[in-house]
Amino acid sequence: MGKRLWLWAPLALFAFFAGLAGYMLTQDKDEFVESEMIGQPLPDFALPAAFDGLPGASKADFAGSPKLLNIWASWCLPCIAEAPQLEALKAQGVEIIGIAIRDRPADVANFLGRYGNPYSRIGSDRISEVQLAIGSSGVPETFVIDAKGVIRYQHIGDIRESDVPKLLAELEKAQ
Amino acid sequence: MTAEIGLAALWLAAALAVLQMVSGAFALKAAPGEVNALAMHARPAAVVQAFLAVLAFAMLLYAFATTDLSLKLVASNSHSMKPLIYKLTGTWGNHEGSMLLWVGVLALSGGLLAGFEKRLPERTMGATLAVQGFVALGFYAFLLLASNPFERLPVPAPEGSGLNPLLQDIGLAIHPPTLYAGYVGLSVAFSLAMGALLTREVNPAFARVLRPWVLGAWVLLTLGITAGSYWAYYELGWGGWWFWDPVENASLMPWLAATALMHSVSVLAARDALRTWTIMLGVLAFSMSMLGTFLVRSGVLTSVHAFAVDPERGAFILGLLGLYIGGAFTIFALRAGAVAEGKRFAAVSREGALVFNNVMLSAILAIVLLGTLYPLLTEAFDVRVSVGPPYFNPASAIFAIPMLLVMAVGPLLRWRSDKPARLQFELALIAALVIGVIALVSFFGQFPLLPLLGLGLAAALAVAALLPLRGRSLKRVPVATWGMVIAHFGIAVALFGMACEGAFSKERLAAVVPGGTEQIGDFAVTLEGVTPVAGPNWTAIEARLAVRQNGGAPVILTPQARNFWSPPQSTSESALLTKWNGQLYAVIGQQAEDGRWQIRVWWKPFVTFIWYGGILVALGGLLSIAGRVSVDVRRRKATAQGDQRRADLDALGAAAPVPAE
């Protein structure tokens, strides 16, 4: 009998695994690794202007009220897709400070000319230095920064229409 | 049009899989020694199916080669500006294409088995083909219902959207297909094991049929893992050669099971022992292949290897896994008790050593499996953990160290029963080498424990691996024995590389101004300059490093930080300087505010031996296959000649002589 029971052991182990894996498949997967920087103050930075039309960006510019920090680039296709949503946020009275990654002034101006300019300031990050310092690995990404300069929320990827209320709520929470 | 031909071929192949399954099952209804009339369709069904599945894959290959942007798969994974070679490799660099490749290889090996294997009893063969058809059917269903590679777009896309740049590499051309072919070889082993279990024909003849498939799969897995390790080493730019990443583990686990299976099959073929154990490992090896596919494709685990994942497809694969593996283990539990026990043997014997090492391999497999699935388990309770080298290295070493020692001694033992006293010289030599090398190395400095043990074991194993050749005429040693000797020696070589990398690597991370020099080991590395460069679909900054060994002539290394567009992603291209005794590994990082560049350089002594060892191990496997097959062919020819002579003598009316054995 002992030997017979041993023969069932692989099946029992497998059933346990299958049950666990099945359960995990039904769980909503948190697709993004949250930045360690959530709850941390912004690192100190001062970036030069990305083109002639707007001033550059620095940490001090986030003082006063909650703002959005949008990391983007003129060469990034999803950034075109998210441009209307940024315009919508701006229309709701949200101040958006941009950081353009590895970009050229002429391209930035061209992009803003074609797809609209929702930004109050744009800093030029030619070597992704600030981008990496705030825990972002791609474009576009958007951060909610409160009045004290603390990172409160991170949105990875382009902002879809359905993401706008969530961002507004996070800005509200950051008051 | 070609896409429609491919799709039609797939549907037809699926229909033939049903025929193969049903017809094969009828073979079981035949009385022993007879053939059921309905069972005769299984073999042709498998052969035609192989042609159809290969045709479907060829059609997809054509669509990628010509960048047919009306296909959804091509539009979302390729790009007209990609070099042709990467267009072709892009065929299987995505979910649907890789599953089609899997199915194609599966059908091809089913066809080969059905077409050429005549040694098994028809009942076992029928049952095997039925199982093979059943397995294939599940994957056809998966392809056709949940991941159709031939789906057309309503409107052709103007341009494709690229390929993961990390995977845009010649390594990708070889690595996944090799692993897949290995996995599929294990599926044939699985079908054969189930066939033999259903007919209770688990015997040496069955083992001889099983062996080439297991060996072949094992060689391919060995090569696949070796190539994958080297790919991760130079492409990820982190300086490591094994990260215990879920995707890497997914390829390691079937290899461990296949290694155990291969040795177990040899015992069954030579000594008619370990019957149940062989069947069990046959099921286990394929389970691990499917589990690997599930883990990689479902996205339940996070990995550095970015695959497109989809929980629904994960559910489908999990369903297949439950059906095949759950079913197989159920049949195993019900049937294995009825398989007659094999021959017995003493604890100290060749079989004893093989069983011990099979248990050790299984234990390592359990360690890796647990470590890989543990994050899944804790995540069920909302705890995110990452299991890494601090767990895997010591936990697997606990079992790997005794295994390597027994591996040194095992091939020297006799079958059935042996006395340790007979091997006094060999045992003393092995012990002296282990202790001597460890003492010698410790004398020169403080090194971590595991690499130190690894060096001692590598030296002992390298010598012990050659001992089976001692006192024999090298010309008369069978090819298969050469295979074993070379494979075991290859393990020693790889172990030596791993231990050296662990013990003696030097690392230097420095911020350098252009023109500045850093010293690492014997090498002086000068940053001559940093320039932007552009490729077909990327731009990069490239550092020009002049490397001088002991003040000699400079060698130029050009590590790059690349930025791809479509999709935008940045990668780090390492630059390697290979010497006979190691590699210099250089990566360029960010530029600091003051204009200095981060340069990261490693000197890794003998690191290349890891992969040389892997290639030797695979070569040993190939020799073993060649040896076994040539013996089989000679035996078959001799039998045929004997039959011919007897027939001739019969025709002449003379009395047939008794054939000499």
What is the meaning of each model-derived region?
Chain A
Residues N70-W75:
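Aromatic-flanked redox-active Cys/Sec active sites in thiol-based oxidoreductases
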Residues L68-L69, I96:
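Hydrophobic beta-strand anchors of alpha/beta hydrolase catalytic cores
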Residues I80-G116, R126-L132:
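Structural microenvironment flanking redox-active thiols in thiol-disulfide oxidoreductases
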Residues Q27-D28, P48-P55, I122-D125:
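Short gly/ser/thr-rich secondary-structure transition/capping motifs
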Residues M1-P48, Q175:
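N-terminal targeting signals for export/organelle localization
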Residues F45-K67:
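A short beta-strand-turn-helix
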Residues G113-P118, D125-Q175:
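Thiol/disulfide oxidoreductase modules built on the thioredoxin-like
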